[in-house]
Amino acid sequence: MTMQIKIKYLDETQTRISKIEQGDWIDLRAAEDVTIKKDEFKLVPLGVAMELPEGYEAHVVPRSSTYKNFGVIQTNSMGVIDESYKGDNDFWFFPAYALRDTEIKKGDRICQFRIMKKMPAVELVEVEHLGNEDRGGLGSTGTK
């Protein structure tokens, strides 16, 4: 069964988005021209607001070409938009930090999102032992 998501566009000039068959991510585009100077931060408007189904959230990340094409990184590594952010004026943004002077044009694909189920309710139970030996971590796999 296909999930339906209600979407509102900032205005009629925004490119309509859709999911393509070749992947699990949906591209998002800049809603306006944005100039960012090196070492500057800006919220790039994406021109969409959505009403996610109950129990789901959106994960927003840069496209693989975002840094190469625009010289920006997403400041929070991954954006998480939960089901409560669904008002008529709750438009999505891409938090961009520029590592060089750059121009992002209206319609440029700069990030992507996917819909994920929210984490189930959990209870953290404090214990003295976890039942296994220390395994290393921090790059230790396969070094012995």
UniProtKB/Swiss-Prot annotation:
Keywords: Hydrolase, Magnesium, Metal-binding, Nucleotide metabolism. Pathway: Pyrimidine metabolism; dUMP biosynthesis; dUMP from dCTP (dUTP route): step 2/2. DUTP binds at S64, N76, Y85, F93. One of its GO terms (molecular function) is magnesium ion binding. Pfam families: dUTPase. Its EC number is 3.6.1.23. It comes from Bacillus subtilis (strain 168). InterPro entries: dUTPase (IPR008181), dUTPase-like (IPR029054), dUTPase-like_sf (IPR036157), dUTPase_trimeric (IPR033704). The lineage of its organism: Bacteria, Bacillati, Bacillota, Bacilli, Bacillales. This is Deoxyuridine 5'-triphosphate nucleotidohydrolase YncF. Belongs to the dUTPase family. The active site is at D82. The uracil deoxyribose moiety interacts with the protein through Ile-81 and Tyr-85, which discriminate against the ribose form of the nucleotide. Its cofactor is Mg(2+). Binds 1 Mg(2+) per subunit, coordinated entirely by the nucleotide and ordered water molecules. It is an enzyme of class 3 (hydrolase). Involved in nucleotide metabolism: produces dUMP, the immediate precursor of thymidine nucleotides and decreases the intracellular concentration of dUTP, so that uracil cannot be incorporated into DNA. The Ser-64 side chain changes its position upon ligand-binding to make contacts with the nucleotide phosphates. It catalyses: dUTP + H2O = dUMP + diphosphate + H(+). One of its GO terms (biological process) is dUMP biosynthetic process. Disruption phenotype: No visible phenotype; double yncF-yosS deletions (both encode dUTPases) are also viable. Homotrimer.
